[in-house]
Amino acid sequence: MEKEGLGLEITELRLGLPGRDVAEKMMKKRAFTEMNMTSSGSNSDQCESGVVSSGGDAEKVNDSPAAKSQVVGWPPVCSYRKKNSCKEASTTKVGLGYVKVSMDGVPYLRKMDLGSSQGYDDLAFALDKLFGFRGIGVALKDGDNCEYVTIYEDKDGDWMLAGDVPWGMFLESCKRLRIMKRSDATGFGLQPRGVDE
């Protein structure tokens, strides 16, 4: 099948950058004698200058402007550099993000943005709105007289009472919030209601 007569040069698949026309003589396999002729001269100098000798005549390889300009996406950016460039932007807001919030007796989890709250009072108001329950704000302010207690998991995996540390430290270390019944919250330094020391 002859390609020249059918005009299939445009649709021919080639290995190389798009928009670069390479002489058809260079695309075909070369015979041993042609390889010896090109290697007899300083082949690397001729290739760098764009002059290719084959059989004694010299011809200039055409480089189109598209081939000279940088191809989009080349050179490939290492995934390590991509991840680190994203981390630099996110490290300015350390700890500010969405955390999971669970409540005892509620069969679903919620997520909330801690960065939107300005302090523990705003957090209590947001949690009240989130679960439609009016006891969470009281639990954060006056934990002794409430049925529920708000605890959080810090970076180390320890569960601590919300409100015991300054707000900035809470934002940096909070990974998860849990609103649990006071009777179930053993081991947090809490006593059941009505029990005096």
UniProtKB/Swiss-Prot annotation:
Localization terms from the record:
Nucleus
State any GO CC term: nucleus
Residue ranges, annotated region (Disordered): 35-67
> What molecular functions are annotated in GO for this chain?
DNA-binding transcription factor activity; identical protein binding
Could you tell me the superkingdom of the organism this chain comes from? Eukaryota
Chain ranges of the PB1 domain: 96-184
- Comp. bias intervals (Polar residues): 35-47
**Record flagged with keyword Repressor:** yes
Q: Which GO terms describe its biological process?
A: auxin-activated signaling pathway; response to auxin; stamen filament development
Placement of sequence motif EAR-like (transcriptional repression): 13-17
Q: What induces it?
A: Up-regulated by auxin. Up-regulated by phototropism in hypocotyls, with a higher level on the shaded side.
Q: Which UniProt keywords apply?
A: Auxin signaling pathway, Nucleus, Repressor, Transcription, Transcription regulation
> What does this protein do, in the record's words?
Aux/IAA proteins are short-lived transcriptional factors that function as repressors of early auxin response genes at low auxin concentrations. Repression is thought to result from the interaction with auxin response factors (ARFs), proteins that bind to the auxin-responsive promoter element (AuxRE). Formation of heterodimers with ARF proteins may alter their ability to modulate early auxin response genes expression.
Assigned protein family:
Belongs to the Aux/IAA family.
**Partners and quaternary state?**
Homodimers and heterodimers. Interacts with the auxin response factor ARF7.
Free-text note on domains in this protein's UniProt record: The N-terminal half of the protein contains two conserved domains I and II. Domain I includes a slightly degenerated ERF-associated amphiphilic repression (EAR) motif which seems to be involved in the activity of transcriptional repression. Domain II is required for the correct degradation of the protein through the SCF-mediated ubiquitin-proteasome pathway. Interactions between Aux/IAA proteins and auxin response factors (ARFs) occur through their C-terminal dimerization domains III and IV.
- This chain belongs to the protein called Auxin-responsive protein IAA19
**From which source organism is this entry?**
Arabidopsis thaliana (Mouse-ear cress)
